[in-house]
């Protein structure tokens, strides 16, 4: 008996797998922020669907690889200063820098790891 399944049919069946997740859209704001040393800075990240606490925050400086700051929405990576904090769950998350230092001037990214393409 021939058990081969056409690729098109297999793709269609995969769409109906129980628990299959759709793509998650992420919106980070503000896209550009002006701040001075000593300021309290807040960056938000909103998901198109709930991701529990499967969110990480990264800091990237020019010419360097991104560095993990926070994972599981609010857990500080070892060695990261306590002025950084994360909060939120579900669809809305926040990264806060309580007292901005000169070495904190960088690009910040949020990343969800609840669902992968």
UniProtKB/Swiss-Prot annotation:
Q: What is its main location?
A: secreted
- Where do the segments described as Framework-1 lie? 23-45
Where is the segment annotated Complementarity-determining-1?
46-56
Q: List the disulfide bonds.
A: 45-110
Identify the stretch(es) annotated as Framework-2. Answer: 57-71
Give the start-end ranges of region Complementarity-determining-2: 72-78
* Keyword terms of this UniProt record: Adaptive immunity, Cell membrane, Disulfide bond, Immunity, Immunoglobulin, Immunoglobulin domain, Membrane, Secreted, Signal
Q: What does this protein do?
A: V region of the variable domain of immunoglobulin light chains that participates in the antigen recognition. Immunoglobulins, also known as antibodies, are membrane-bound or secreted glycoproteins produced by B lymphocytes. In the recognition phase of humoral immunity, the membrane-bound immunoglobulins serve as receptors which, upon binding of a specific antigen, trigger the clonal expansion and differentiation of B lymphocytes into immunoglobulins-secreting plasma cells.
Official protein name in the record: Immunoglobulin kappa variable 1D-8
| Species, as recorded | Homo sapiens
